[in-house]
């Protein structure tokens, strides 16, 4: 799975770019503010329908332009596909696949599985549970065909239930929602639990390589007491939910807890160690997908050198090379990515939103 070509129009500070990409490493080098991260964000947006630095379309559309347009050629298991995405300032989104309109963003996400590693990505480890739920849900989305529909339906039903809690006085008035919510909640929790169990060995092996000085443990918390029946719990907690005006327990409260030597990792590890752990989790997840389905992720690394010394950068470079996946890496200087440069790599110089191929010695 790789992007062979990327066209960018009116995205962030990039007016226009047409990039022929390497199947291996693609390095984006240039000073801060030059547009390196914008290229990474364009790749990410093509696969997700939204940018990773802003959820508002207007903020990523170039100044005084009506929309951004992204287009890519995808080499997927010896089959080439064409994908496109445009978004207007009003939020209108158009997805095109192989020349036809009317497709969903979820189809792009399925075609272009990506792992994003950014300085803001520490939230996976020291942010709230929603970031770790997203980690599990990425895996479930790519491994369970019914997950996306089930999770979308559950979110819709929970939103309706929460709205109803503001208006009802008896549990019987919201029982109809619970009858739909309960089977979805149980199925989603089963998928998440199965995925966390299945990927545990990959995570442990990768973490042992990156952080051998710590004994790391991982546990999935489904969002309600494991000894309780979810339906009975919803009925029992109705008055509390009504007072709160939201549903306090369920898969929307799940977590994937990570400890080092029995202590929450955010309380023990340095920033450099947290970045290594974040990279280990992303790599393990990508490698698990490859083993399960034969598909390879695209890895996007922004500000590669931050928080990592030379030895750790070299270790990460070796692991990324071993995946044989397509990798996009931004750095301030070519020296920072010297350990990654190889015959399958391509170097791009980015300045003021202009992108040029830079010859490698």
Curated annotation (Swiss-Prot):
Organism whose genome encodes this protein: Yersinia pestis
Domain of life: Bacteria
Alphabetical GO biological process terms: DNA replication; DNA synthesis involved in DNA repair; double-strand break repair; SOS response
Disulfide bond positions: none
Entries under Pfam families matching the protein: SMC_N (PF02463)
PANTHER family: DNA REPLICATION AND REPAIR PROTEIN RECF (PTHR32182:SF0)
NCBIfam families in the cross-refs: recf
This protein's encoding gene: recF
Entry protein name: DNA replication and repair protein RecF
Family: Belongs to the RecF family.
Biological role: The RecF protein is involved in DNA metabolism; it is required for DNA replication and normal SOS inducibility. RecF binds preferentially to single-stranded, linear DNA. It also seems to bind ATP.
Sequence positions that bind ATP: 30-37
An MF annotation (GO) of this entry: single-stranded DNA binding
Keywords noted in UniProt: ATP-binding, Cytoplasm, DNA damage, DNA repair, DNA replication, DNA-binding, Nucleotide-binding, SOS response
GO cellular component annotations of the record: cytoplasm
Cell location: Cytoplasm
